[in-house]
Curated annotation (Swiss-Prot):
Belongs to the SelA family. This is L-seryl-tRNA(Sec) selenium transferase. One of its GO terms (molecular function) is L-seryl-tRNA(Sec) selenium transferase activity. Converts seryl-tRNA(Sec) to selenocysteinyl-tRNA(Sec) required for selenoprotein biosynthesis. Keywords: Cytoplasm, Protein biosynthesis, Pyridoxal phosphate, Selenium, Transferase. Gene3D superfamilies: 3.90.1150.180, Type I PLP-dependent aspartate aminotransferase-like (Major domain). The gene is selA. The keyword Membrane does not apply. GO terms for cellular component: cytoplasm. Pathway: Aminoacyl-tRNA biosynthesis; selenocysteinyl-tRNA(Sec) biosynthesis; selenocysteinyl-tRNA(Sec) from L-seryl-tRNA(Sec) (bacterial route): step 1/1.
Amino acid sequence: MSNLFKYLPSVDSVLTRLEEEGVIDGLPRTLSRDLVNGFLDVCREEIKGGIITEEKQLSPDVLFPRLTCHVRAGAKPHFRRVLNGTGVVVHTNLGRSLLAESAVKAVTEACACYSNLEFDLKTGERGSRYSHVEKLICEITGAEAALVVNNNASAVLITLETLAKGREAIVSRGQLVEIGGSFRIPDVMTKSGAFLREVGATNRTHLHDYENAINEETALLMKVHTSNFRVIGFTKEVSGGELAELGRKHDLPVYEDLGSGNLTNFSGLGLMREPTVQEVVAEDVDVVSFSGDKVLGGPQAGIIVGKKKYIDAIKKNPLNRAVRIDKMTLAALEATLRLYLDPETAKREVPTVRMITEKPENLKKQAQALARTLRRELGETANIGVREGVSRVGGGAFPEQDLKTFLVTVVPSAKVTVEELKEGLLSTEPPLVGRIEEDAFCLDPRTLTREEYKLCAEAINQILE
């Protein structure tokens, strides 16, 4: 084994050949050298592990194709496009919502050009970045005032820090949710300086539970919408309207965190009823917060709406500077919100809303079109079929609720297994993510555009050929 190490090429000789072949054109010399060193380290480990056992395995004709693949893979951007064939619309691991075309255009312009981010074009003086979206948000939701921060966790943090720091916030025990990434409402509350006062039981909380807990240290009544899980059976929760009435009786602000939140009524899709932001604001809840990049279909943002006196207080919190949104988020959010001025336009132009509301008959046609593309590209290397299935909204919204869809199934006819196909597709360019059901690799056209069908076929062909 030890003799095999001497047949490994030198770094400089490898770099020379890579340059001659044009493999590292445009790459910094240091990056190229690091990639080559990394590949040679892999070869050394393979010699030690008994994977490379013969001199011919280290010949240039054998090593160079592997090296080329290694270098090209290492030179690719780490953050890149992925084809989402999972059918999960707001896939939190694949970037959440897709932006509308107008929002993409607005972001591009904001990046490439100077703008009136904090400049009042009427007076020629300094302006507020929030002026670009506050009026829009209020018009759509019916709220008196609004503020946008960088995500909904920040919205919860700054709201609690402003309205309840050093005092108690009363919350139902059944609403102490974990919002993802191991971040929990009690932890956020602790960080804000507010003290948690739990009331009720896990499955049932009554209005009198809140009222009995009110004391001289109470600063806030809080309701957390459990959008990412369901408690079913013997349950009871207090509505935002009831809590708002109790708050007025005791001169206490009421805050509702809607989580994913939505501006669209999705009734008629077979999904359980979820309150819209407009409905919660209409219940006279003082402060409401929700996400911008989930069911709403915009960029990552935390949107806070409500009574002007409370929103103004939150705006003045020094923490607002630390959690404010940047110009790209602002541009994307304004463009997205403008689409919501007409609900039908939003359903048509906001990709997230369009995908959620797509009719099953249209999805069947899309699945058939995708299947035809795959058959043309793959030939006899795989059996392609279409069958009924389910999609999910994702993003912590409508948990355990299914949307009817049609899946395209791929079963390799050769030596590649379904599991190997799924794993191999993660390394194609672009990577393709799907799911395995009933011994078949499945693609859901709900989360794929027609322009991506050929890319899916080419990716699968790379693994099967």
